[in-house]
Amino acid sequence: MILRKHSYFRYICILIYSCLMPALLHSQNVVKQISNADGLSNNSVNCFLEDSEHTLWVGTWDGLNAYNGRSFKTYSYNKKDAGSISNNVIWQIIEQSDSILWVSTDYGVNRWKRSTQQFTPYYLGTQNNPPKQEKSFLLGITSGKHIICYVKEQGLFCFDDRRQEFVSLKNDLPDDIRNFVIDSKDRIFFLTGHGQLLHYQLTVRNSCLKKKSGTVPPFPIFIFPRTASSLTMTGR
C-alpha cells in the first residue's frame, strides 16, 4: 500500500514537471546585442528608456531610435520637416504618459506625441543663441507628472499642459548647475559644478522653489544616480 502511494506521488510529480518545463524554458531571459548593424543610428548611446508600450527608446549621438523588439525606427532632425526632432544629439528621454515622451537634445527639448509621431520643440530662450555646452537642457518629472526643465544660463521652467508652453519658476539657483533629480516627494536635488548639493522643495502650483537646509554633505558630490526609492551620492 505504501509502495503504491509512493508510485502515485512520483507519477503526479513527473506530470507537474512535464507541464511546467516548457513554460520555464520559455520564460528564460534572452540577451541580445544590438548595434548599427541592426539599424541603430549610432553605437554611441547616451540614454535609453523602455516606455509603457514596451518600446525601447535609445538616444545616441546621431538620432533617437525606437526599437519594438524586431526593428528600429530612427527619428532625426530635418530642417524641411517642422515635426522632426530639434537636434540629433540625444541626452534624456522621459515618459510623461503613455502617449507623450519628452526628449532633451543639445539644442532644445522636444515633446513627442504618439498619435501623430511628431515632435514639438521648445528652445526656452535659446532660439537666437544656441548653447555652447553639452547637456545644457536638463529634464525631470514630478510625482504629478509635471515636466521640469533646467536650461543653463536661462533658468528653471515648468511645462504648463493647459497653455502648452514652459513657464519660469522663481528660484535663487547658482549659474553652475550640472544636474538635478526629483524624488517621489517632489524634493529637488541640484548638483553644482563644485560638487555642492542643493536641496529644494518644489511647489508647481505657486511656480516657485522653497530652499531646504541641513542636507548638504560635507564632501563634494560628482554623481547621484536615483532609483525609485533612494538617492545615492558619490563623492571623492
What are these regions (language model features)?
Residues 1-236:
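Carboxylate-rich, polar loop motifs that coordinate divalent cations or form catalytic acidic clusters
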